[in-house]
Amino acid sequence: MNLHEYQAKQLFARYGLPAPVGYACTTPREAEEAASKIGAGPWVVKCQVHAGGRGKAGGVKVVNSKEDIRAFAENWLGKRLVTYQTDANGQPVNQILVEAATDIAKELYLGAVVDRSSRRVVFMASTEGGVEIEKVAEETPHLIHKVALDPLTGPMPYQGRELAFKLGLEGKLVQQFTKIFMGLATIFLERDLALIEINPLVITKQGDLICLDGKLGADGNALFRQPDLREMRDQSQEDPREAQAAQWELNYVALDGNIGCMVNGAGLAMGTMDIVKLHGGEPANFLDVGGGATKERVTEAFKIILSDDKVKAVLVNIFGGIVRCDLIADGIIGAVAEVGVNVPVVVRLEGNNAEVGAKKLADSGLNIIAAKGLTDAAQQVVAAVEGK
């Protein structure tokens, strides 16, 4: 779950980290009033969406008058911002952030993620602030400096100083950087985050460090113990199908193809998408119904998949372990009948009571194709899309 920039900065303030004074606004009038609260300009106005690349898309602007602030707010509030990180529809702009402009001398980068290979929280710092860190990692990886947090001791001040020295910082900037490093690490661990990023972390012309931007990603599996973060969730920024799937504990990710996929198990779901592509098809989604593939969840999964107008066929791939395939077949038959599926449905069942389940599908009289194996399922669903 991602947070908006203004929400990230509110969290920074609670932990004593330096950030520009700013206010999130939902109307042009609020935006003008925010400028008055901040004081003399110039100000920076920023569209609040869960996507990068806002500046290049016109969603960030430095302004010198309250009239310009009102014009920016009137232009963007209620509209959608399209960036290189969004789809063609963009993201809705429901708030803009008005904050004091900062005199920038130098831009740095500081962020942290959970590194699965080392099984540690890893902090990354670079002198290449203001640039996508993925681009820096690809083109100039030697400019990214890393430290890993020990899960027993947690963050240590010497690690912050180590990064500061590698960035070429001196004097009070080393102390300021170390404080920010320790604060971010504390936020990351206490708030169950999956990602934290300040890009850019700037050195002002007055010689101080300030968090000019903020990006936080919370671990969705830990939100039950982070009620205040859960309240910050903005579902308008999420794919509505993904939000609907989450309510039914379905793992759904929309893709660009035309073959809907419904599978139990994340690994099997990825393998299913691979074999569909191997046979010339394009998956329309990743959807893992999990171990409890009940009729109700299967029905809901069909509704979500078919809400995508691009879907021309559906492949259901179920491995029956604890769950019996004949019960899954009953669920599929009931779901197809209830939802009114008008596209071909190819079903591959394997495991516990698979033969009984396949017979039920064959005898149902519905437009359901029972596949004999995974390869056969992929070939049949691709052929169905091609009208063969």
UniProtKB/Swiss-Prot annotation:
Q: Which GO terms describe its cellular component?
A: cytosol; succinate-CoA ligase complex
Record carries keyword Nucleotide-binding: yes
Span of domain ATP-grasp: 9-244
Name the InterPro entries for this protein.
ATP-grasp (IPR011761), ATP-grasp_succ-CoA_synth-type (IPR013650), ATP_grasp_subdomain_1 (IPR013815), Succ-CoA_synthase_bsu_CS (IPR017866), SUCC_ACL_C (IPR005811), Succ_CoA_ligase-like_bsu (IPR005809), Succinyl-CoA_synth-like (IPR016102)
Entries under Gene3D superfamilies matching the protein? ATP-grasp fold, A domain, ATP-grasp fold, B domain, Succinyl-CoA synthetase domains
Q: What EC number(s) would the UniProt record show?
A: 6.2.1.5
- The UniProt record gives the binding positions of ATP as K46, G53, R54, G55, E99, T102, E107
Official protein name in the record: Succinate--CoA ligase [ADP-forming] subunit beta
Origin species, per record, is: Escherichia coli O8 (strain IAI1)
